[in-house]
């Protein structure tokens, strides 16, 4: 269903800068109900690609996993540990290139995305690379051969090394969900 709407434009208050403007949009209540939004569960995620704005209901970690698996997507579950303690779980939908994190530790230094509770695919890719030997390291090819990896593919390196680094006690497991 497609509808045309007008923006509600007003002046911003509070700590907004001088002459700041706010923009709002009234949405049909049937759409809101169909999305499962309620006064108690009203948080949404906004995505902007330069031309379109997409509004989706914010999913819990379990809902994200279920929706991705139900859609038949390739989903990876990464468990992040500090020593023996499970600190976070990352669900990576490789089909849609979306990611969801469930933080289980209070210390942001033990979390894969720090204080970022809503990482995007690029954040995930950066995290994977951070848990690997740098691409520019001398002797990289010999290292990859020694661990049995054909090329510089962060996820494959992590599968072999558990993403262990000399400077911390963090490590990862990777599981493909069916």
Per-range role (PLM):
Residues 1-178:
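Phosphate/dinucleotide-binding and metal-coordinating scaffold of catalytic cores
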């Amino acid at each position: 269903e497609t509808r045309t709407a007008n923006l509600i434009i007003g002046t911003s208050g509070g700590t907004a800068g001088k002459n700041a403007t706010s923009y709002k949009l009234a949405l049909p209540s049937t759409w809101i109900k169909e999305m499962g939004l309620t006064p108690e569960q009203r948080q949404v995620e906004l995505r902007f690609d330069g031309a379109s704005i997409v509004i989706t209901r914010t999913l819990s970690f379990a809902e994200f996993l279920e929706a991705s698996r139900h859609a038949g997507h390739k989903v990876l579950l990464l468990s992040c540990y500090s020593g023996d303690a499970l600190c976070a779980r990352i669900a990576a939908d490789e089909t849609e290139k979306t990611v969801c994190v469930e933080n289980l530790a209070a210390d942001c230094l033990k979390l894969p995305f720090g204080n970022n509770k809503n990482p995007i695919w690029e954040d995930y890719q950066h995290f994977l690379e951070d848990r690997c030997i740098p691409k520019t390291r001398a002797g990289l090819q010999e290292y990859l051969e020694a661990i049995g990896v054909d090329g510089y593919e962060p996820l494959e390196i992590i599968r072999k090394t558990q993403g262990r680094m000399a400077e911390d006690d963090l490590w990862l497991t990777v599981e493909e969900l069916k």
